[in-house]
């Protein structure tokens, strides 16, 4: 075995550096997989890179990220910057920092990715560290963590679309972190581009100087070369002292099959090398460092990481449990605990959307469990609980930050792990205030109190609300207000920030938001609207549990807590849709939707009818009555003791979007 490994090592070392680099960039690494590619180090001439980095003082470090709305060109601009600095080959790469299949398919960034770049400006080398952050509200935890490791940001706006909801939200996140913002207008090459409008919006909305803006086209590379000198001149260098005791912030982590948990870290003070012993302030656990390095663009080992740098480390022996890597934790060297003040951490993201996931085939449960656990190693914001359903068997209740987060996770389960799953519609948590003063948050509709308990022991029921910010052209204002009002919204503000664009703020129930509100909004505005939201607390609400009953027996997999205004509509929809997928039986099947004790909708499936009168003489009336009566009694008995057989595919079809 050792001989095999040595021969592989000999083969890889025999490759010319240019060959190795070309192959690694032509087939970009999927850095978030738990398989080998993330662990494979990029074979660059490390000594040359390391010598250049060693000669650069902290005053010539720049840590920056790109702040933008979804689809405004962050990942494409990142590619151009990596090409410009020679980190990757020009033209051979598409979205180098978007590693996941789902990111490339949807054109979105899900995980924050990082890369170090070396750039010579006016005869001096600079070490630039770029973070490509997600733009969507569901991945805000990724965004805020990334900002903590940066000193400035490029505020990117699409010249054809102008400022959008998530541009505003991400601007305020970056502003709150104290980042220096450089305005950049992208896609100026488009026929529909209006750079002046975008500059005016930046000035009016964010009070940014239009004179300092850089107008670029990330796709064609136009003016991109002006960006890096602007970054160097306008974004401040990180502050740190390499002679002080180590103070290191954990920004992110991912799991490797071979190396255990790998940590992405930002050094504020001191330096770290392989062999150093470090201790976590959050857990008190001690580790020996196995390797340190930078992302260039893959893992590139270094002999040392210094104050001001962002890089990766892993331990030897390995950190095996990803739960030990608490994002926002501070590490220092063993013996320096009393000399170092821990850095302020990050707020843990709270799951706000819940679904149940079941395998289509019950025998696939172990595979599904293994697949979910592997994905959760790289996404700690997902919550996981085992649950069981009489109808669908063993499964899991999963909690997500939002509906896109949920949808991306589902896509990754199917694409990366080949999972065949049934996913229930998304639900939101509800708060129960009991008469004895206790409060309980319920995330599973099956655990919602029954009617008798509600009347006897519950004081109040509450549901979560969000403050939604919607931006869209003025011509769609009437339709959008109508949509928000029909979804139990309450208008908070209306603002015209250009002659044609509107910013509308509404408080909406989260339950309405996850019920395809964004899809309806896009339909009402022909795709021109954007949406961002933040939590707005809990409010008293008239809610009840809606259940589906088959022959008066509740189907546990299909229950939902809804507002009283939605009960009738949803109940009728459920029974008519479920009827389409249930096969006829030897007895009548009654499908009902019930809220508490009230049946709000009903459908019946007629039984198969055996002709018991086939052999009778037409005149034999008494015999005819007797046989029909007997058949009727037999059906009653069968209905009383018989179980309705509902195929798995019926649930699959019913729960399908």
Swiss-Prot record:
GO molecular function: GTP binding; GTPase activity; mitochondrial ribosome binding
E.C. number(s) listed in UniProt: 3.6.5.-
Record's bilayer topology term: Peripheral membrane protein
Protein name: Translation factor GUF1, mitochondrial
Predominant location: mitochondrion
Root EC class: hydrolase
Species of origin: Ajellomyces capsulatus (strain G186AR / H82 / ATCC MYA-2454 / RMSCC 2432)
Annotated function: Promotes mitochondrial protein synthesis. May act as a fidelity factor of the translation reaction, by catalyzing a one-codon backward translocation of tRNAs on improperly translocated ribosomes. Binds to mitochondrial ribosomes in a GTP-dependent manner.
Stored Pfam families: EFG_C, GTP_EFTU, LepA_C
Homology family: Belongs to the TRAFAC class translation factor GTPase superfamily. Classic translation factor GTPase family. LepA subfamily.
Location of the protein in the cell: Mitochondrion inner membrane
Underlying gene: GUF1
Catalyzed reactions: GTP + H2O = GDP + phosphate + H(+)
InterPro entries reported in the protein's UniProt record: EF-4, EFG_III/V, EFG_V-like, G_TR_CS, LepA_C_sf, LepA_CTD, LepA_IV, P-loop_NTPase
